Amino acid sequence: MADSVHFPWMPFPPRFLVCTRDDIYEDENGRQWVVAKVETSRSPYGSRIETCITVHLQHMTTIPQEPTPQQPINNNSLPTMWRLESMNTYTGTDGTYWRLLDHSQMGDTLQLILDIVICEVD
């Protein structure tokens, strides 16, 4: 498991993210985060099936008025709000726990990567 790394010039991860539109979340400072990518994978684990959902969020200084058509994103599995519980765990409004895999900056873009593993009985 990757732990989040904080550099002196990096702000801390958002304390909470609230969904304001299908693909946009807003944090406690009014910064907007775009859902850039949602990855889903399934794998058998004993008598269970595990589903892993990984969400890539990027802080954008300007938000497009319409969702980008080139990459449709299914956000049905994402909570309407995440709250930071510890340095590497967010809790969703649906009671789910999401790991903070990455909080980094590349150029002017801040990025958050969160994931969750859901076990289903076969």
Curated annotation (Swiss-Prot):
Signal peptide: none annotated. It comes from the Eukaryota. InterPro entries: TCL1_MTCP1, TCL1_MTCP1_sf. One of its GO terms (molecular function) is protein serine/threonine kinase activator activity. Belongs to the TCL1 family. This is Protein TCL1B3. It comes from Mus musculus (Mouse).
